[in-house]
A protein has these predicted regions:
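Basic Lys/Arg-rich amphipathic helical interaction modules
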Residues: 1-46, 66-77
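Structural signal for short hydrophobic segments within the conserved structured cores
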Residues: 26, 54-56
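Basic/aromatic recognition patch in beta-strand/loop cores that engages polyanionic ligands
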Residues: 45, 49, 58
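The DNA-recognition helices of helix-turn-helix-type DNA-binding domains
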Residues: 51-52, 76
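Short secondary-structure boundary/hinge segments and terminal tails
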Residues: 52, 65-66
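Short Lys/Arg-enriched helix C-cap and helix-to-coil transition segments
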Residues: 56-63
Length: 77
């Protein structure tokens, strides 16, 4: 395999590690997703309320794991 070739699993793992190092978190909230995507707050809230978006409820907050977020991004280009 050429060193420039990566499979999807490797790319997802690298992106999860990059975001984890940048934000110091394993879960993203609305504000984090706004920073990452550049979307507005209302659009991110709509996205987080979409049943197809991989959120988890912790207490009264909706969050998404970094891994699920990155996988979702790759599957929804």
């Amino acid at each position: 395999m050429n060193t420039n070739e990566f499979n999807t699993k490797d790319l997802i793992e690298m992106e999860v590690n990059r975001l984890s190092n940048k934000y110091g978190k394993d879960y993203l909230d609305c504000e984090d997703i706004i920073k990452i995507t550049g979307l507005g707050r209302n659009n991110v809230r709509t996205l987080m309320n979409n049943p197809k978006f991989p959120t988890t409820i912790i207490g009264r907050r909706k969050v998404v794991s970094l891994t699920n977020f990155v996988v979702w991004q790759f599957n929804n280009k």
